Structure formats: structure tokens, C-alpha cells
Amino acid sequence: MTTTDRAGLGRQLQMIRGLHWGYGSNGDPYPMLLCGHDDDPQRRYRSMRESGVRRSRTETWVVADHATARQVLDDPAFTRATGRTPEWMRAAGAPPAEWAQPFRDVHAASWEGEVPDVGELAESFAGLLPGAGARLDLVGDFAWQVPVQGMTAVLGAAGVLRGAAWDARVSLDAQLSPQQLAVTEAAVAALPADPALRALFAGAEMTANTVVDAVLAVSAEPGLAERIADDPAAAQRTVAEVLRLHPALHLERRTATAEVRLGEHVIGEGEEVVVVVAAANRDPEVFAEPDRLDVDRPDADRALSAHRGHPGRLEELVTALATAALRAAAKALPGLTPSGPVVRRRRSPVLRGTNRCPVEL
């Protein structure tokens, strides 16, 4: 990040957020989505999916239908590199290099390590949930402990994740959606220099969110927890279906490294394309009853991931950790009930991060 003056950085963050709000208030759904105020963005996702390939006033091309989303994710001409600076950002004196680049570097990073065995992970997670009658915050007391403990096998140092990764958890959101100044500064300070470790930091928040979404989905589906307890393979199918409905990354930013045609539109070299993965994975042209959780879905293999086409094994690691957590918690889930509202993190259009989820066992 080249801006060292706090006042200057704060002005840039506020300027970009204000322009997002202004564009969105005048009918552009993409910048309004970036503001991160929706409790449930599905209505906006449906509208974007039905609009086809569309160029936002932010100069970003937005893709939300399954066929075009898959085309972008599969085309090696689209990468996570940083593209050209939009003219409106340049005119506002707030190029991404001065407020978003550290977070775009996190998004572009990859991890190539060894994924731990799911069965061994599940055994190690067995004591994370307290006994019956306990009240807890599903986020802090369980979901975040999964990557902290699970990635210890990868890093050999849980303390690294316990502190710094929590501060950096906004990184994937901050590459597109300006955060508050103090949050931005804390996140930048927490980011490690090693790209692989940066990827793991991003994976920690992705894992925690997936665990929360999976636990809530299973506890709301009669008989599913018992099925997972009896059949470990059901946990993997459940996590896959939860990730279809609630992807680890709802939005995926790619940059065209060459001129590419998408439908009737030509995307120029250096232009940015955002794939609304969460909309594509509920495309009724592809999935029967797309809004319904169905762990035996015959078309499950058609679900898209934001990591598709990007190198590394981070997605495998996130899936393994979430699957192991579900297996470890399965016997306790039939007795789990919400004891308060789920609090989603604002300014979180990419991750749809969860801040707090009070439950009782």
C-alpha cells in the first residue's frame, strides 16, 4: 500500500464507498452489492443473473448466469491479476494500488501444501463442542477454532492464526469493498509476507464461514445430522451442497489478460470481470429446485467454485476442514437450537462473513 498518510487513506476509502453508494442508488446493482448492506442478497443475485453479461458503471463486467460464469472461470485468459485502474477511480484520486492492493495480493496468492486426512481431522475436532446444555457463539467458540486447530498441522504454529488471521479476515472483502480505516489498517498490519501464508489466512475465514453455514443447514434439516453421524461420506456431500448454496466466495474477481468475447460483448485486455458465483450456483437453467438443500443432488458436480481455474489446493483444504468439523459435531447437532440472531458482517459482499451466531446445545 503506497499511502502512508492516515487521513489520505481514510479519504480514499470513504470516497470509493461513497461512489459505490451513489452508483448503486441510481440503479446499478453491482456497486450496491459491494456496499454490503443486504441481509439476504438473493433478490439482487436473481436480478443480476437475469440481466446477462452487463457492464457496471464501475467499469466492471458482471457475470451471474452459470454458463458464462463457467466460461470465465475456465478460461486461462482470466486471472486474479490486477487490471487497469478505472477512470472514475483515477479521477477520484483513489486508485486500487493505494487502498486495495495488499488485499488483491491475498486473493491472488495460492497454497500448494498437503491436505490433512479428514478422518484424522475429525478425531482432533471431537472436543471442540461443549456438552449438552451449553450456550456458545458458533463463530468464535467452534467455527474459528476449526481452522486454528486444523491448520496447526500445516503451519505448526496455531498462535499465528489465532491473532493475526482474525484481524486479516476482511482481506477478500477489502479487495473490492472499502472497509473502515481502523479495520483496514489492522488487516494490512496482520498480513504476513509469505504468499502461501496469506492464502491460508484467507482460507481460515472461508473455513469458519463454511462451518457456520453447514452447521445451521444441517440442524435445520430433519434427520440429516443422524445420517452424517452414521455415514461419514454424507458429510462430504453435505458440505458440497452447502458450498453450492453458500459459496466460500460469493464474488470472484478476474482480469482479462487478452481480449475475450463473452456473448455479444468483447472484454478488453486489462478489464475486470466479476463472477457472481452465488447467483450462478442457483441458476434454474442448470439446477432443479436451486434454492433447496439436497445432499443427494444428481447435478451436484455442476456447482461452481471461485477457485476454479486458480492454482493451488486451498479449496481442498477448506472443504476438508469443514467436512471434518461436520463429522465431529454431527452427534451434537440434533440438539442445537439458535439462541439469538445470526449477525453477518457488514461490508462483506465477497465472503458474507459471520460475526456472531449464538446457539444452545
UniProtKB/Swiss-Prot annotation:
Any single Pfam family the record assigns to this protein: p450
Keyword Hydrolase: no
Superkingdom of origin organism: Bacteria
Pathway in which this enzyme or protein is active: Antibiotic biosynthesis; erythromycin biosynthesis
CDD domains: AknT-like
Gene Ontology biological process terms in this record: antibiotic biosynthetic process
Keyword presence, Transport: no
Gene Ontology MF term list: heme binding; iron ion binding; monooxygenase activity; oxidoreductase activity, acting on paired donors, with incorporation or reduction of molecular oxygen
InterPro entries assigned: Cyt_P450, Cyt_P450_sf
Keywords: Antibiotic biosynthesis
Quaternary assembly: Heterotetramer composed of EryCII and EryCIII.
Family recorded in the similarity comment: Belongs to the cytochrome P450 family.
Summary of the function given for this chain in its UniProt record: Involved in the erythromycin biosynthesis pathway. Acts by forming a complex and stabilizing the desosaminyl transferase EryCIII.
UniProt-recorded name of the protein: Cytochrome P450 family protein EryCII
